[in-house]
Regions:
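Non-globular targeting/processing and membrane-anchoring segments
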Residues: 1-9, 23, 30-199
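Short glycine-rich or small-residue beta-strand-to-loop segments that form or flank ligand, phosphate
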Residues: 9-15
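Conserved redox-active cysteine motifs that mediate thiol-disulfide chemistry
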Residues: 15-26
Length: 199
């Protein structure tokens, strides 16, 4: 799947309350920043009542992303604010028909383990070539950490936080590099290209 200009598309569907989305967003921001630039990212935390709770993260809602290599379309479907009328969370963004069709087709068995896992988030669609559904690493690694602590830990490659976030970011980068023909070289390094073989 490409956009009108022929650039490959990455589509993300998640929600602000979701702790697994909270964890995945860190890796997505690291990976996507290798190909382009974000603006308007805002801090948010996952639900205080979910497990793990209160994960410090960013929201893609209200942000923009520019890249000459790919198009990134994020959809944050719900906030982290409980909605007593539904027992869920308040609606934030509604997926388009096309985005909902991707979720319905690909976020279901056999791409998830069972029917009760259908619709799992985070859901990341890499241009019709790859899927990432659910958590890529243990979100509890981020439990109790504030944004500045996580950012600081990312500068220490031996920290559990950096290993989890950057390790996942490298796999996301590898998937994107497969779609961009290994461009740019600054992102699609030899290490990343070796990861492409495992996708």
């Amino acid at each position: 799947m490409v956009d009108k200009s022929g650039k490959p598309r990455v589509v993300y569907l998640g929600a602000e309350y979701c702790p697994y989305c909270a964890a995945e967003r860190w890796s997505m921001i690291v990976a996507l920043s290798r190909f382009g630039t974000f603006s308007g990212l805002s801090t948010v935390h996952s639900s205080t009542t979910d497990t793990p709770s209160n994960i410090s993260t960013f929201t893609f809602h209200g942000s923009s992303y520019t890249s000459k290599y790919l198009t990134f379309t994020p959809v944050e479907m719900e906030t982290n604010i409980p909605d007593s009328s539904t027992g869920g969370y308040t609606t934030l963004q509604t997926p388009t028909k096309e985005q909902q069709a991707l979720l319905t087709k690909w976020d279901a068995p056999p791409y998830v383990a069972s029917a009760d896992q259908a619709g799992a988030i985070p859901f990341i669609y890499f241009g019709g070539k790859y899927l990432s559904i659910g958590a890529s690493y243990d979100a509890t690694i981020l439990s109790g950490l504030k944004w500045d602590q996580i950012a600081s830990d990312l500068n220490n490659p031996d920290s559990p936080v950096a290993k989890a976030i950057n390790g996942t970011a490298n796999h996301i980068t590898a998937a994107i590099c497969k779609m961009t023909g290994n461009q740019p070289a600054s992102a699609c390094t030899a290490t990343v290209q070796s990861l492409e073989k495992s996708l």
